[in-house]
Amino acid sequence: MTNIRKTHPLMKIINNSFIDLPAPSNISSWWNFGSLLGICLILQILTGLFLAMHYTSDTMTAFSSVTHICRDVNYGWLIRYLHANGASMFFICLFLHVGRGLYYGSYMFMETWNIGVILLFAVMATAFMGYVLPWGQMSFWGATVITNLLSAIPYIGTNLVEWIWGGFSVDKATLTRFFAFHFILPFIIAALAGVHLLFLHETGSNNPSGLSSDTDKIPFHPYYTIKDILGALILILVLSSLVLFSPDLLGDPDNYIPANPLNTPPHIKPEWYFLFAYAILRSIPNKLGGVLALVFSILILALIPFLHTSKQRSMMFRPISQCLFWLLVADLLILTWIGGQPVEHPFIIIGQLASILYFSLILIMMPLASLMENNLLKW
C-alpha cells in the first residue's frame, strides 16, 4: 500500500515541498532565513488578527484603543509588542535573506529573485501603513511626510496625494484605508511567498559554492527540518527577550504622544528598518530626485542579475568582490545611522557620500571587480 503522504493531492504538495524535497547537502545557516521569514509572517498575521479584534480605525479612538489593548485586554501588551517587535525581526531576517542572495548569487534564479523584490516592496508598504495605525505623533507625521513625497510626481502628483489621503490632509479617511490595506496585504504577501517557493522549487536551491548540486542531494526532512527548528528557536529567543525586557527599544518615544496636526515633532524619522532609504532620500536636495533615489535604492535589486559579469556564481572564491560586498554592508549601516540623525553638518555630507558609494558599489565597482577577477583566473 502506498503512503498517503505521497498520494493525497494536498499531502503530496506538502511532501514535495517540505519532506521529500531534494536539497543540496552543503547549504549553511544562511539558508535558514526563508523559513524564519515564513514563521515571522505567520506570527504577524496571528498577532495582527488579535489586535484587529480590539483596534478601532477612527482618529478619535485609535490611540485610546491601542492603550486599551495594552492595559485592559488579557495579554494585550504581549500581543501588541510581539507584533511591533515581530516587524523588526521580520526586517532583520529580510535583510539577511537578501544579503545571502547577493553574496551567493541566488539572484541568478530570475523569477524567484523578482518575486522576492516585489515581496520586499509589499512588506515595506505593509510596515509603513502599520506604523500609522497607533495614531501617535510619529504615526501622523510619518504618514504626512511619506505620502507627501508622491506630490513630487509631475502633473498628477498633487491629485494623487489627495486621492490617497481621501481629503486635503492625513485624516479619518486615510487612517481607515491604511487599516484596510494593512489587514489585506499580509495575505497577498503569503500568496506571493507561495509563488516565490513555487519558482524556487522549479530550479532547486542554490548552495554556498554556486556550483550545481544535482549530484549530491539529501532529503529536506529530517536534515533541514531540524536545522530550521534550531533557527526558529533562536528567533523566538531573541524576539521574546526583546518583547519581555525592552519592548520599546526600537520604537520612537514620540509615538506615545497622541497625533496632533498642529505640533510637528522636532525630528521626523521612520522605524529603524527604513532609515537607510530615508537617508538616501534626504541626501538629494531636490524633491523629485530624492523620491527617485529612494525608489531606485530598492528597485536596484531587480537590476542585479543583469549586472552579474563574473564567470562564477557565488562570491565564495572571489575575494575582491567579497571586500566590496562587506563595504556595501558597512555603507548600509552608515546610511541607517545617518537616517536617524538631524539634518545638519557633518551628517548631511556623510549621508551624501554614503548614498553615492551605495549606488557606485552596485552599479560600477562590483561588476568591474567581477571582470577583473575573471582576468585574474585567465578565463
Swiss-Prot record:
Highest classification ranks of the organism: Eukaryota, Metazoa, Chordata, Craniata, Vertebrata
A GO term for molecular function: ubiquinol-cytochrome-c reductase activity
Annotated cofactor note: Binds 2 heme b groups non-covalently.
InterPro entries found in the cross-reference section: Cyt_b/b6_C, Cyt_b/b6_C_sf, Cyt_b/b6_N, Cytb/b6-like_sf, Cytochrome_b, Cytochrome_b_C_euk/bac, Cytochrome_b_N_euk/bac, Di-haem_cyt_TM
Alphabetical UniProt keywords: Electron transport, Heme, Iron, Membrane, Metal-binding, Mitochondrion, Mitochondrion inner membrane, Respiratory chain, Transmembrane, Transmembrane helix, Transport, Ubiquinone
Miscellaneous information on this protein: Heme 1 (or BL or b562) is low-potential and absorbs at about 562 nm, and heme 2 (or BH or b566) is high-potential and absorbs at about 566 nm.
Subunit structure and binding partners: The cytochrome bc1 complex contains 11 subunits: 3 respiratory subunits (MT-CYB, CYC1 and UQCRFS1), 2 core proteins (UQCRC1 and UQCRC2) and 6 low-molecular weight proteins (UQCRH/QCR6, UQCRB/QCR7, UQCRQ/QCR8, UQCR10/QCR9, UQCR11/QCR10 and a cleavage product of UQCRFS1). This cytochrome bc1 complex then forms a dimer.
Protein name stated in the entry: Cytochrome b
Gene responsible for this protein: MT-CYB
Gene3D superfamilies in UniProt: Cytochrome Bc1 Complex, Chain C
Species name: Mogera insularis (Insular mole)
